[in-house]
């Protein structure tokens, strides 16, 4: 077994100009590391699994900024020096080799890239976590947002909550998998490679773990965490699992396309985000783990990967932005991440738009605006009527919080309740002044664009 890299050596023109150079530099660096790892492994004459484990220790040590190091020190190391570093850590203990998966392509080994480079290299395909967008099941992204992400549009407004989820998941991944192994008796097989589908080359997968079950069954393990607020994990009740995780794991099984992999176990551990300090605390009780098996469904795998390949060839390769979704709020949120808001650049010159091109669009906008105004008027009238009638009923109830509406025979037709409901609010301005660090961690800024269309009345000649 050898280290492999099959990243594209030439960067396609459809990628955004701001990331093309960085992509090229990163790809070259990964190829260089791959070659050096193979040369050093040959020198040590260690098995792939043992060399991989020890070389990973070397890479992590030389990449750790807390030790005053940086990854450039590893890159400057010769194969001979790397071999010496690995041999110095060898204690005669052997580690298992990876499993060969002949029906998929190894893109590269994620164990020997930084998190920053890993995020950059995700531009080379559609991953499992992207699949829910293609299947219309994502509450957080749209086709337009996925297009911006894959071609490499620079992020204008970072999503702090998404970054928090990623950091938490990465930090707790081994804990979740290890807890599952203790519960089930499963054995974790070493795996850290990014894979690419043979049939659909723009579809990629980076499984969290390959597990050997006590029955001899080989499965994928996908670790998840969820903040357990008052123990209300609604999406995980009664054996249910969030739909986006189902598409993600189904896509993984499709990319691997191996008859030995019969299913994927989705394993979720409730956690608490420690407010200060950035540490993540998981439950100590393994029974708190939610787990659900997703068996192979080759028809669904095909449906997902066909949609991903079609998206890539239609939009990414052609540099064509998809149409907005039917969710205007989500469209706006996603677009603000990648497209600078006009209010952020007050110095921009006034633009001229073609009347012939935009008149029809503006007329449709005006009609929609008029319909909305009429609906708002009706809503306001209905609300006033409702409130007036409610006040008459409340007056009849006097100071009671509950009343029965009975007929002459005593039969109850309605039960009316009028209770006080308290809502907590945070004084954000005061919080920002008193505890700026906490505000920075949990606060966010929203932008509102004031849009209007006014007809211009032509002057009489």
List each language-model region with its residue ranges.
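Accessory terminal regions of nucleic-acid processing enzymes
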Residues: 1-461
């Amino acid at each position: 077994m050898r280290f492999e890299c099959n990243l594209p050596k030439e960067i396609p023109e459809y990628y955004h100009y701001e990331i093309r150079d960085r992509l090229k530099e990163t790809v070259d660096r990964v190829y260089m590391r791959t070659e050096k790892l193979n040369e050093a492994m040959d020198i040590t004459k260690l098995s792939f699994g043992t060399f991989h484990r020890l070389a990973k220790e070397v890479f992590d040590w030389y990449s750790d900024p807390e030790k005053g190091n940086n990854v450039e020190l590893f890159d400057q190391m010769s194969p001979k020096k790397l071999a010496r570093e690995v041999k110095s850590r060898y204690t005669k203990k052997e580690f298992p080799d990876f499993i060969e998966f002949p029906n998929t392509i190894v893109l590269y080994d994620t164990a020997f890239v930084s998190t920053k480079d890993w995020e950059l290299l995700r531009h080379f395909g559609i991953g499992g976590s992207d699949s829910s967008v293609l299947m219309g099941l994502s509450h957080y992204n749209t086709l337009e947002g996925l297009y911006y992400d894959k071609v490499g549009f620079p992020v204008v407004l970072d999503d702090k909550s998404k970054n928090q989820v990623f950091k938490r998941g990465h930090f707790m991944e081994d804990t979740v998998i290890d807890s599952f192994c203790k519960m089930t008796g499963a054995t974790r097989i070493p795996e850290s490679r990014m894979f690419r589908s043979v049939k659909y080359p723009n579809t990629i997968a980076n499984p969290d773990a390959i597990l050997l079950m006590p029955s001899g069954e080989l499965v994928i393990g996908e670790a998840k965490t969820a903040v357990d607020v008052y123990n209300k994990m609604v999406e995980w009740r009664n054996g249910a699992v969030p739909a986006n995780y189902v598409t993600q794991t189904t896509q993984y099984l499709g990319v691997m396309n191996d008859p030995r992999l019969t299913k994927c176990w989705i394993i979720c551990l409730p956690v608490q985000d420690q407010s200060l300090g950035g540490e993540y605390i998981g439950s100590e009780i393994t029974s708190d783990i939610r787990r659900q098996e997703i068996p192979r469904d080759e028809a669904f795998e095909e449906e997902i990967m066909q949609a991903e390949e079609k998206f890539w060839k239609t939009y990414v390769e052609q540099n064509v932005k998809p149409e907005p979704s039917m969710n205007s709020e989500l469209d706006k949120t996603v677009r603000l991440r990648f497209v600078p808001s006009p209010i952020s650049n007050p110095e921009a010159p006034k633009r001229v738009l073609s009347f012939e091109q935009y008149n029809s669009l503006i007329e449709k906008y005006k009609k929609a605006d008029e319909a909305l105004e009429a609906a708002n008027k009706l809503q306001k009238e209905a609300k006033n009527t409702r409130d007036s009638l409610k006040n008459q009923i409340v007056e009849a109830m006097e100071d009671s919080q509950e009343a029965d509406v009975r007929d002459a025979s005593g039969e109850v037709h309605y039960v009316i309740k009028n209770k006080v409901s308290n809502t907590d609010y945070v004084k954000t301005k005061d919080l920002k002044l008193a505890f700026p660090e906490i505000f920075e961690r949990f606060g966010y800024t929203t932008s509102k664009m004031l849009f209007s269309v006014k007809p211009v009345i032509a002057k009489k000649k």
